[in-house]
């Protein structure tokens, strides 16, 4: 029973078909990998080619900032969200009401009022014990477009382990955040649950953010069975 519910790593057939369609539709929008032409070292070139074959091209004109702790990324995340002019995409496994997420949500609500398009996606099981029932409806009431990924169904199902463990923020297509930290207070050590929590992360600026944008849209569109 436990294996059927949580051990099966394969997505439901319907969801897998939706993901496959979205991936094929997205492939033409992946930037051509011009970096390959610039690399002389055969070992490095081979690694870049391998990544490129899996639709993870290496980009020029990009910067990265490393965070050794979630609390280091937190303030930069708030600062960059507040600067958004066009759109914000956020996709997280766990969100929980508290200092971290409440600060994020306040900015998102303000950005909606300013005309910025805000899309938010959280995993229904990852946040199951953290949020009120149908929390996505609350976010939608603020004008935030929201998806609760793969709704939990309270009976034995072979597809309940199809979860979205990503932690991604994309701002205006040129600022991105990713890493191991979710949007909950334990990830910035405001709440001590299992001792001092350490998850790393990065802020990306420039062309490399394009792939994060595409990754978000693939999951978003597959969940809605739409194309954008």
Question: Can you name each region flagged by the protein language model?
Answer:
Residues 1-228:
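N-terminal localization/anchoring segments of enzymes in phospholipid and broader phosphate metabolism
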């Amino acid at each position: 029973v436990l294996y059927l519910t949580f051990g099966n790593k394969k997505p439901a057939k319907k969801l897998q078909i939706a993901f496959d369609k979205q991936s094929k539709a997205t492939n033409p929008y992946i930037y051509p990998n011009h970096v390959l032409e610039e690399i002389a070292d055969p070992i490095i070139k081979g690694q870049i080619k391998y990544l490129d074959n899996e639709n993870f091209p290496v980009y020029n004109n990009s910067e990265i900032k490393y965070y050794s702790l979630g609390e280091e990324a937190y303030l930069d995340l708030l600062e960059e969200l507040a600067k958004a002019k066009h759109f914000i995409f956020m996709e997280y496994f766990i969100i929980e009401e508290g200092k971290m997420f409440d600060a994020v949500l306040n900015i998102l609500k303000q950005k909606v009022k300013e005309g910025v398009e805000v899309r938010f996606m959280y995993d229904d099981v990852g946040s199951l014990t953290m949020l009120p029932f149908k929390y996505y409806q609350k976010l939608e009431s603020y004008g935030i477009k929201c998806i609760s990924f793969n709704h939990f169904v309270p009976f034995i199902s072979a597809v309940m382990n199809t979860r979205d463990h990503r932690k991604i923020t994309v701002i205006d297509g040129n600022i991105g955040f990713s890493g191991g930290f979710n949007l909950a207070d334990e990830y910035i050590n405001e709440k001590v649950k299992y001792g001092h929590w350490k998850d790393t992360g990065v802020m990306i600026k420039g062309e490399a953010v394009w792939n994060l944008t595409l990754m978000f849209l693939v999951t978003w569109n597959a969940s809605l069975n739409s194309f954008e």
